[in-house]
Amino acid sequence: LAPKAMPSSLDKSIEPLSLSESIETLKDHLIENPEDFSTWKMLGMAQVAIGNLDDSIDSFENAFEINPDDIDLLLQYSSAIAANQEGQFLGKPQDLIEKALAIDPQSIQVLYFAGIVAAHQADLDLAKEYWQKALYLMPDSHPDRSVIEEALETILNLQVK
């Protein structure tokens, strides 16, 4: 059997969806599947990517109502709210990070964010503790290691002054 030529309708390249088109596709999916946690979370991340923080916060809130214990969601959600509050992690972002810390006190990402919250509250000793623990848990080759090392160095320099 020799393979036949592909029909001309399948021969054309499929153009990837733009981020805006993807967002609309996700929204359409959620109309039929409003309890789809993963899609709400993905929609929130896509909305952050295009700078639509208010809508992303709403999407993350919907995901949170479905699964309030997903650590990645808690961090994404807190980051979106903080970005909407000019980088401030006080209030709800802090509550979400504290919840994530209670769920997984060994998570490097959670420890990093907990350090940010502590630093925003001028609790430099606590920020240092969180970041040192994150570094201890993190492999030397981890690509984000330098970010935490720089944050820790900043704290140490502030404590010396």
Per-segment meaning from a language model:
Residues 1-25:
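Long, contiguous interaction/recruitment modules in multidomain scaffold/adaptor proteins
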Residues 7-12, 37, 42-49, 54-104:
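Alpha-helical adaptor scaffolds
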Residues 25-28, 62, 99, 133:
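The canonical alpha-helical register within tetratricopeptide repeats
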Residues 49, 83-86, 120, 154-158:
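Register position in tetratricopeptide repeats
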Residues 100, 104-122, 126-134:
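Soluble extracytoplasmic domains of inner/organellar membrane proteins
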Residues 126-161:
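Terminal, low-structured helical/coil segments at or just beyond the last alpha-helical repeat
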